[in-house]
């Protein structure tokens, strides 16, 4: 039985009396964001809007993006990646549970030195996928777009991980699963968190 989003007390800056706000709004005020489901345009737009707002409010304070997601839309993921790199506030990414497909790409796209995986996080990378249907000319165009996106994602993974393109291309050919430690060795994250390294 779902319990809904709990309410928590929060005192807005300049207010003397706390208000009851939902948990996620409280966490947003602390600059904590979640990618906790499949990524589509709606969720990407919500994350992007929150990052833009919080960065404009105070670019000197980091944002913390917790990721537990099977991935999702390539274009939605690229929009989150671009906004993370566009905003002036640094974005720390933290993998929790499972970061797969575009979610692993977003995890790797955090601020260098601030890409973290919790000890039991699993990470999976693979090539962009898409279903093709329609007239033959449309299928050809869609296939060309998938190939273009695959090359783009491959080049970006090279930049993010330091792995050679040949390794990335080979590893993207099929689902590649990594433990938190293996993700660090691969260059997808910089740190495997422990209780001593936890920040938020």
From Swiss-Prot:
Name of the protein in its database record: ATP-dependent Clp protease proteolytic subunit
PANTHER family hit by this protein: ATP-DEPENDENT CLP PROTEASE PROTEOLYTIC SUBUNIT (PTHR10381), CHLOROPLASTIC ATP-DEPENDENT CLP PROTEASE PROTEOLYTIC SUBUNIT 1 (PTHR10381:SF15)
GO biological process per UniProt: protein quality control for misfolded or incompletely synthesized proteins
The species this protein was found in: Ostreococcus tauri
PROSITE patterns cross-referenced by the UniProt entry: CLP_PROTEASE_HIS, CLP_PROTEASE_SER
UniProt xrefs under CDD domains: S14_ClpP_2
Pfam family, one: CLP_protease
Catalytic activity, as annotated: Hydrolysis of proteins to small peptides in the presence of ATP and magnesium. alpha-casein is the usual test substrate. In the absence of ATP, only oligopeptides shorter than five residues are hydrolyzed (such as succinyl-Leu-Tyr-|-NHMec, and Leu-Tyr-Leu-|-Tyr-Trp, in which cleavage of the -Tyr-|-Leu- and -Tyr-|-Trp bonds also occurs)
Active site location: 101 (nucleophile), 126
Lineage top rank: taxon: Eukaryota
């Amino acid at each position: 039985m779902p319990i809904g989003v709990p309410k928590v007390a929060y005192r807005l800056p300049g207010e003397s009396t706390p208000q009851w706000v939902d948990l996620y709004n409280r966490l947003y005020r602390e600059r904590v964001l979640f990618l906790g489901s499949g990524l589509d345009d709606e969720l990407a737009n919500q994350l992007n809007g929150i990052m833009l707002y919080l960065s404009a409010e105070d670019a000197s304070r980091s944002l913390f993006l917790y990721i537990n997601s099977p991935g999702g839309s390539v274009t939605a993921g690229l929009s989150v990646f671009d906004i993370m790199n566009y905003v002036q506030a640094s974005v720390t990414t933290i993998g929790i549970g499972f970061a797969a497909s575009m979610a692993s790409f977003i995890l790797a796209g955090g601020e260098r030195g601030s890409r973290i995986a919790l000890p039991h996080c699993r990470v999976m990378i693979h090539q962009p996928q898409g279903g093709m249907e329609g007239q033959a000319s449309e299928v050809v165009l869609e296939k060309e777009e998938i190939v273009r996106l695959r090359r783009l994602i491959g080049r970006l993974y090279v930049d993010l991980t330091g792995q050679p393109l040949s390794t990335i291309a080979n590893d993207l050919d099929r689902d590649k699963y990594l433990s938190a430690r293996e993700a660090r060795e691969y260059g997808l994250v910089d740190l495997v968190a422990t209780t001593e390294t936890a920040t938020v």
